[in-house]
Amino acid sequence: MPQTFTLKQRIALAIVPRIASAVICCLGVTLRYEDVTDPDTLPGYDTPPPAIYAFWHRCLLASAWRFRNHGITILISRSFDGELVARTVERLGFVAIRGSSSRDGAAGLRNLQRAYLAGNYCAITA
């Protein structure tokens, strides 16, 4: 069932993702990364698909910039906040799949599994 949003929410959905993605881009160009891996292991972004990434919530801003435009499929909550996040990361080149523990979680995981089996990169947050 499609979500319905109040006028205030629709305005926020039209504005916030644009501003948030612009802020991520502005901050992202100032970030420097150091890949720390075992010498025999490829860094995560060099791993051929399908692969699963797990990100800590506290690292989402840096991860959104680092892994932008890779077509990574992300499981995102069906809440209003999740809608803001989904629209923001889609502007950065991610694919959003919706589902959470309280709203369509099983369907979200099944869709994430389908994306993985189709050969896509997938991501979850911890």
Write out the residue ranges for each language-model feature.
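Short secondary-structure transition/capping segments
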Residues: L13, D81-G82, A123-A126
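Conserved Motif II region of HX4D acyltransferases
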Residues: P49-I52, N111-A126
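Membrane-anchoring hydrophobic helices of lipid-metabolizing enzymes
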Residues: M1-H70, A86, Q113
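Catalytic core of membrane glycerolipid acyltransferases/transacylases, capturing the structured
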Residues: P50-L109
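Residues forming well-ordered secondary-structure scaffolds
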Residues: R18, L84, A107-N111, L117-G119
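Short, basic, glycine/proline-bearing loop/turn elements
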Residues: V23-C25, V95-R98, A123-A126
